[in-house]
Amino acid sequence: MTKEHSEQQKDLRIRSKVISEGVSRTPNRAYLRALGFEDEDFQKPMIGVASTWSEVTPCNMHIDGLARASKQGISEAGASPLIFNTITVSDGISMGTDGMRFSLPSREIIADSIESVVSAENLDALVAIGGCDKNMPGCMIGIARLNLPAVFVYGGTILPGKLDGKDLDAVSAFEGVGQYNNGEIDKEALHKVECAACPGAGACGGMFTANTMSSAIEAMGMSLPGSASHPAVSTNKSKDSRAAGKAVYKLLEKGIYPKDIMTKEAFENAITVVMALGGSTNAILHLLAIAHTIEVDLTLDDFEKIRKRVPHIADLRPSGKYVMAHLDEVGGIPAVMKLLHDKGLIHGDCLTVTGKTVAENLEQQPDLTDNKSIIDFDNPKHATGPLVILKGNLAPEGAVAKISGLSVTYIKGPARVFDSESKATKAILNDEIKPGDVVVIRYAGPKGAPGMPEMLSASSILVGKGLGESVALLTDGRFSGGSHGLVIGHAAPESQVGGPMALLEENDTITIDAEKLEISFDVSDEELERRNKQWQAPPLKANRGTLAKYAKLVSSASKGAITD
């Protein structure tokens, strides 16, 4: 018997067989017959399609069609597909409001729900489709928990908005608020930006969190080559989804599981691509969480080790000129990976969802067609990666800074301390913040907020007011992938558990040195001891529901803000 014939005969119902066969499972099958199952369908593996379709965000408004394309691909491959939904929240719409506290917890809800449905229904494999920021890590954590054959599909990037011949993105609207407050544009001009920034379906267009994570997942080998950069409205995106349905069936046939793909070296490939592209600080948090789930030993030190050897080569927003759709036009993530592989920065022997290795996937990949305007390895934006891990007496477990596009990587100035983003934003808009200040937003961590919200409103207004390189912004919360300027987040331990930020007082001198990888404040040990004795943890800001449960379970940001 040939190997091919043997594979065809292999029973791929690795879990669903407990429902598909046996007299005692007659009632179970009756429910599936209501869905249209016939006798022959029970002889096939059952493959789930986890859809994050929703009308609460443009990132996900089109995903139902992609889920149906994946369903078609699964059927054509010879399996029985079942679509189910999970949630999404819109980071952009909730930004700057209390709703932003639910963004990071939604990552866990997505993972929990995917794990729950696939486990309860005894599905054999999975295609997961995500659009907005937390969809990607949520789907990947769910995939890692299940360790069943799986392919991730990214819903795709939005196209750039157009106004007066210039490209816009969602961050243009956030920064426009600062420009309006500073008197640089009037209300009519701001309204035009609002109306033009987001032209249709897809996730935020720059190298923000969604595009960063889609790139990381493709580099890790868990998405089909090229799919990370295809725009949401392109015909390629539907093709990606259909192909994913066929690919997951092949993984099931070959017995290839996420643990076979998501190795330490695969995570190193993901980090390498994130550093080269100048990706979001959120990638650090999410990759730590995914690695924990798949039982790969990944720490902040691994990010710093890779950062030192990988140049930042992409001129992408938020600090650069171009968006993901432009990168797609010149070859996308495969072309970037081929360049990095040729330079010896990528592990080529890692397995991927194609069933081939990274190197095998890249063999037929054309080189970048860019004239070095978007990607330039020989003249990088920075000789090392832009996501810097800082440590010191203000963040003993670490903090994350993004230095892309900055001419200033050092600041020493007085702390301007706020216990909420809204208070800090009000002070910025009222011109109470001056060049040289270090704005501190604390009690914004995983437990303290709870939910570790992003500070895009505050950071964007600073940039819009021309203070992006003269005022630092420090928090135990997060920053959007759209944030730029001198921003430092993820400070750990967080304030809520008595981290050093909780002991800061107005006008304490803070030193941030991205070159020396240091973050500290000039307060004597004796004074710190006195403050520590007086400090009391404030009551948690949620005592029931989603946020209360999250606050009780969540770990430090330095561990990925995991909940298990």
Curated annotation (Swiss-Prot):
Required co-factors: [2Fe-2S] cluster; Mg(2+)
Residues the record lists as N6-carboxylysine modifications: K134
Residues that bind [2Fe-2S] cluster: C59, C132, C204
Recorded superkingdom: Bacteria
Pathway: Amino-acid biosynthesis; L-isoleucine biosynthesis; L-isoleucine from 2-oxobutanoate: step 3/4; Amino-acid biosynthesis; L-valine biosynthesis; L-valine from pyruvate: step 3/4
SUPFAM superfamilies according to UniProt: IlvD/EDD N-terminal domain-like, LeuD/IlvD-like
Cofactor: how bound: Binds 1 [2Fe-2S] cluster per subunit. This cluster acts as a Lewis acid cofactor.
Molecular functions (GO terms): 2 iron, 2 sulfur cluster binding; dihydroxy-acid dehydratase activity; magnesium ion binding
Assembly with partners or alone: Homodimer.
Record's protein name: Dihydroxy-acid dehydratase 2
Organism: Staphylococcus saprophyticus subsp. saprophyticus (strain ATCC 15305 / DSM 20229 / NCIMB 8711 / NCTC 7292 / S-41)
Native organism taxonomy: Bacteria, Bacillati, Bacillota, Bacilli, Bacillales
Gene from which this protein is expressed: ilvD2
